[in-house]
């Protein structure tokens, strides 16, 4: 009897389940999936039951407008900026260690160019999502910087652990003279 593992997307060239390449493409929110059989597979028990899990975290910028906001509401840039090397776009996943991803931090920024327009007042909020490696952030270590209608807004992200398989939503409500950002803990800050 043995365990059976599965990973998506599948890459035929990968032969070592402890070092599966998991690159992040900052242009998409593509996640990687992995799973381990919940039953032992053998000659007698040939069906493997494999529940799948997400390998990455999802970072979401949610855009809304208040009634007094009258600009176009165009989000042209979103950045995560760290005080030291915190980010990477290449890492590996270890199936024998619960799908844990390891990476060597090489960059102080992750930058996206979403070109997303904030919806008109009364419309649903618009989400811009990006896949990121799971990690723990200390208070003040990372900030979110967005450019909306040419104005730059910066928000210091409080201490948090971005876990695999979870979404971390940062809501931005555009108002006439400023923006309000709400983070993971539900508290909002005017920027």
Segments the model singles out, each with a brief description of its role:
Residues 153-160:
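Edge beta-strands of extracellular beta-sandwich domains
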